[in-house]
């Protein structure tokens, strides 16, 4: 079972109010329509009455008018006597008749009536415009022109005529047109603008120079970075690359000492690999750096060893062979100096082999002593 509430809900009440408003509006519209229809009907009746009258010609109308004038029913229209000449406005005629009186108040449709008090209020509200003299001449120039007592300083031309007024345009004096000369402040403003333009140009030039200097510094930094990267690459590739860098510019090295680079090298491996090319005077190794120095008796044998062994693999060891940058004792190696040969033999990079003979004890001696003791 549906339960219907006794009262109306809020929505129903709102709808009922709207319906009542619409009813009122409909009644008002019907009343307006009736009024408009009655007015149109009255206008139509007037038009019909006018149209029903017979059409009269101008000649018959004039004759009827003359008869009426003769009978005295209509008074004749008197023609005004007008002076021949140009037409004048009524306001001007009123001014000529009564010059003491002000202008005759006439109705002007496009101008609202304004009283004198309203004019004063509006003039006080409006921002007063500066005169041409005030707009072109600054306050400092005016103070210079005024004297110590606030009066105009007497100078050449002061008091000779009316005060100076900067009236732009053309003035008719004695039939000739003369334009007023521009004030001094214009020339000052122009000079100031020129100075400002010069300062701006100087600032722009300075900014351009700074930008150029920055670009140069950046180029230098880039060149330095490139050089550093090249040096790092050479260091990574090893001393062989560093020793043989720029082969076109430098003359080929000469010497009898070779620089050998390779991992896990041993003296026996080096002697076996380099002895077939000539007599080896000295062989020194630097295990932490994985390099060794081999000195031949002759330079020809060193050149032959570089040509044959550079980049080859001996007993699973990759060898890089080149002429050493430092050739410490060329004369000693070639045998021209006695003292040089001794220095090479006893140098820190020379031969480190111990010349003493190694004493080897057999196990039988210890066994015999043990047997005799017990």
Curated annotation (Swiss-Prot):
Origin superkingdom: Eukaryota
Keywords associated with the record: ADP-ribosylation, Chromosome, Coiled coil, Isopeptide bond, Nucleus, Phosphoprotein, Repeat, Repressor, RNA-binding, Transcription, Transcription regulation, Ubl conjugation
PROSITE patterns linked: RRM
Domain RRM: 256-326
Residue ranges of Sequence repeats: 184-185, 186-187, 188-189, 190-191, 192-193, 194-195, 196-197, 198-199, 200-201, 202-203, 204-205, 206-207, 208-209, 210-211, 212-213, 214-215, 216-217, 218-219, 220-221, 222-223, 224-225, 226-227, 228-229, 230-231, 232-233, 234-235, 236-237
PTM annotation: Phosphorylated by the P-TEFb complex at sites next to its RNA recognition motif, promoting its release from chromatin. Sumoylated.
CDD domains listed in its UniProt record: RRM_NELFE
Signal peptide: none
Presence of the UniProt keyword Transcription in the record: yes
Biased composition, class Basic and acidic residues, residue ranges: 90-101, 186-250
Family in the record: Belongs to the RRM NELF-E family.
Protein's UniProt name: Negative elongation factor E
Organism: Bos taurus (Bovine)
């Amino acid at each position: 079972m549906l339960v219907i509430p006794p009262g109306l809900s809020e929505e129903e009440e709102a709808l009922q109010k709207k319906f009542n408003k619409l009813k009122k509006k409909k009644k008002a519209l019907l009343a307006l329509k009736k009024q408009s229809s009655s007015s149109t009907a009255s206008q139509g009746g007037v038009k019909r009455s006018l149209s029903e009258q017979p059409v009269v010609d101008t000649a018959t109308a004039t004759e009827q008018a003359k008869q009426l004038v003769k009978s005295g029913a209509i008074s004749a229209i008197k023609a005004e006597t007008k002076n021949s000449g140009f037409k004048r406005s009524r306001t001007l005629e009123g001014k000529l008749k009564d010059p003491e009186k002000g202008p005759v108040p006439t109705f002007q449709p496009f101008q609202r009536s304004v009283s004198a008090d309203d004019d004063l209020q509006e003039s006080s509200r409006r921002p007063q415009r500066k005169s041409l003299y005030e707009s072109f001449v600054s306050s400092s120039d005016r103070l210079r022109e005024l004297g110590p007592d606030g009066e105009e300083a007497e100078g050449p031309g002061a008091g000779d005529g009316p005060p100076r007024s900067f009236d732009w345009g053309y003035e008719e004096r004695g039939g000739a047109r003369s334009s007023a000369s521009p004030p001094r402040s214009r020339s000052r403003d122009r000079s100031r603008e020129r100075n400002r333009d010069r300062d701006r140009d100087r600032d722009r030039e300075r900014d351009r120079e700074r930008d150029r200097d920055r670009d140069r510094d950046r180029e230098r930094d880039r060149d330095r970075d490139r050089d550093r990267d090249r040096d790092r690459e050479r260091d990574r590739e090893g001393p062989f690359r560093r020793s043989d860098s720029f082969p076109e510019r430098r003359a080929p090295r000469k010497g009898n000492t070779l620089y050998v680079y390779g991992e896990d090298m041993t003296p026996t491996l080096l002697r076996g690999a380099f002895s077939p090319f000539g007599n080896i005077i000295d062989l020194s190794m630097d295990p932490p750096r994985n390099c060794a120095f081999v000195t031949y008796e002759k330079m020809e044998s060193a050149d032959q060893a570089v040509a044959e062994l550079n980049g080859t693999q001996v007993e699973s060891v990759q060898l890089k062979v080149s002429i050493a940058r430092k050739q410490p004792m060329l004369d000693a190696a070639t045998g021209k100096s006695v003292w040089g040969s001794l220095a090479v033999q006893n140098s820190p990079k020379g031969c480190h082999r111990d010349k003493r003979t190694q004493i080897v004890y057999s196990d039988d001696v210890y066994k015999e002593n043990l047997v005799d003791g017990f």
